[in-house]
């Protein structure tokens, strides 16, 4: 029986994780659930899964949850940053699902890594921001980090066992790998007239053709910044050079990514676009468990198609690839700028096409400094956020 902590329990990855747990109750126990402010959802899942601990980042939310939980449930409600870091480091915890969205997930994810936990990594921003520090912490503690993002999970499944055991330091060329092919659907605006993009609404941007996701990642998929962040994540997870990484647009979202080998072979992982599949794979690795996902029906799929990315349509993807080449400071700045600009778009303060412009401006205007600690990273993250907020204010 594995004791699990689910960071970001009220989000879409949290819901999918709890669904997989419910399919395999004899193997997994929900030890703790962690959320930010969503008391109603947290109350619902606490009653359903009865964790030992329910942690709310927001203190008022914690108080509200404590008042609403049925008295017969023996659930400890906690709040506070120190309490969260202690929770993920606890000797009672075996596995941590790291699914808090954005930079907010970095401290708790890194704490779990430092504690040597089995970390199921859904928070791509942790690697985008901390990169080398994250990999070094993983190697020092012996933590097992397994990629939950469908693309990185697909790549992981297509690699040799030796490469799987050497995440963060694998020798792709030595394993015969010539290219990692990251696939992406192209989002809801793949075929939209470029002249119409500036008028696209948050509701339109959040209507992904294949996946069910939260609003922030849905917008990132529409701009293809999500693929850019995944490019950066792949660079660190698989110790890949820019020459070894390629992005391929695949509108059907059936092939989740591919690995091309020196001998001409291409290995691909296919499946229905449902996050329960990579989650179940990570939870059980190297075994296999029931995910609750319907088997892929090839006759319904009918055909698979592939396109080269158009950087005029997807400038955010180009920005992320360039930031990756520049290094850790640039990717930290870009991630922070993007979080702010996407939220501004969702709040109706800027246009869809302003996201890329503001991100590029922040990347050029934010002064960087060497990142030698998590405090350095968070300081640069804050600096970039302030610079981006200033740019949005001037725009309006």
UniProtKB/Swiss-Prot annotation:
Required cofactor names: Mg(2+); Mn(2+)
Binding annotation for Mn(2+): 149, 151, 230
Keywords of the record: Isoprene biosynthesis, Manganese, Metal-binding, NADP, Oxidoreductase
Lipid biosynthesis keyword on record: no
Gene Ontology terms for molecular function: 1-deoxy-D-xylulose-5-phosphate reductoisomerase activity; manganese ion binding; NADPH binding
Annotated NADPH binding sites: 10-13, 38, 123, 125, 214
Chain positions recorded as 1-deoxy-D-xylulose 5-phosphate binding sites: 124, 150-151, 185, 208, 221, 226-227, 230
Manganese as UniProt keyword: yes
The reaction(s) this protein catalyses: 2-C-methyl-D-erythritol 4-phosphate + NADP(+) = 1-deoxy-D-xylulose 5-phosphate + NADPH + H(+)
InterPro entries assigned: DXP_reductoisomerase, DXP_reductoisomerase_C, DXP_reductoisomerase_N, DXPR_C, DXPR_C_sf, NAD(P)-bd_dom_sf
Annotated pathway: Isoprenoid biosynthesis; isopentenyl diphosphate biosynthesis via DXP pathway; isopentenyl diphosphate from 1-deoxy-D-xylulose 5-phosphate: step 1/6
EC number: 1.1.1.267
GO BP, sorted A to Z: isopentenyl diphosphate biosynthetic process, methylerythritol 4-phosphate pathway involved in terpenoid biosynthetic process
Pfam families: DXP_redisom_C, DXP_reductoisom, DXPR_C
Function: Catalyzes the NADPH-dependent rearrangement and reduction of 1-deoxy-D-xylulose-5-phosphate (DXP) to 2-C-methyl-D-erythritol 4-phosphate (MEP).
Similarity field: Belongs to the DXR family.
The name this protein goes by in its record: 1-deoxy-D-xylulose 5-phosphate reductoisomerase
Gene for this chain: dxr
């Amino acid at each position: 029986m594995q004791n699990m902590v689910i960071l970001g329990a009220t989000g879409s990855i949290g819901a999918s994780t709890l669904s997989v747990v419910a399919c395999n109750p004899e193997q997994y126990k929900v030890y703790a659930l962690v959320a930010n402010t969503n008391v109603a959802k947290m109350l619902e899942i606490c009653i359903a899964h009865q964790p030992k601990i329910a942690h709310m980042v927001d203190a008022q939310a914690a108080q509200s949850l404590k008042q609403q939980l049925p008295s017969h449930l023996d659930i400890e409600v906690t709040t506070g940053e120190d309490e969260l870091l202690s929770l993920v480091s606890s000797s009672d915890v075996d596995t941590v699902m790291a699914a808090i969205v954005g930079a907010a997930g970095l401290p708790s994810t890194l704490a779990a890594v430092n504690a040597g936990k089995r970390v199921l990594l859904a928070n791509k921003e942790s690697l985008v921001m901390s990169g080398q520090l994250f990999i070094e912490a993983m190697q020092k503690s012996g933590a097992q980090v397994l990629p939950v993002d469908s693309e990185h999970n697909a790549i992981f499944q297509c690699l040799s066992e030796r490469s799987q055991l050497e995440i963060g330091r694998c020798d792709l060329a030595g394993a015969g790998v010539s290219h990692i092919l990251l696939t992406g659907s192209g989002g809801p605006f793949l075929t939209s007239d470029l002249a119409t993009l500036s008028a696209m609404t948050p509701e339109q941007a959040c209507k992904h053709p294949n996946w069910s996701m939260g609003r922030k990642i849905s917008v990132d998929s529409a701009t293809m910044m999500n693929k850019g962040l995944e490019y950066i994540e792949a660079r660190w997870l698989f110790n890949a050079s820019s020459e070894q990484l390629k992005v391929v647009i695949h509108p059907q979202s059936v092939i989740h990514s591919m690995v091309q080998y020196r001998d001409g072979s291409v290995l691909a992982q296919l499946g229905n676009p449902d996050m329960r599949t990579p989650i179940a794979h990570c939870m059980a690795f190297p075994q296999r468990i029931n995910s609750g996902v319907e088997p892929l029906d090839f006759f319904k799929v009918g055909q698979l198609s592939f396109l080269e990315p158009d950087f005029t349509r997807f400038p955010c993807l180009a920005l992320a690839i360039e930031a990756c080449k520049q290094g850790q400071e640039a990717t930290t700045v870009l991630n922070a700028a993007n979080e702010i600009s996407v939220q501004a778009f969702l709040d109706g303060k800027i246009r869809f096409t302003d996201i890329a412009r503001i991100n590029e401006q922040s990347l050029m205007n934010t002064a960087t400094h060497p990142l030698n600690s998590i405090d350095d990273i968070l300081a640069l993250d804050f600096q970039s956020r302030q610079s981006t907020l200033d740019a949005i204010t001037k725009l309006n």
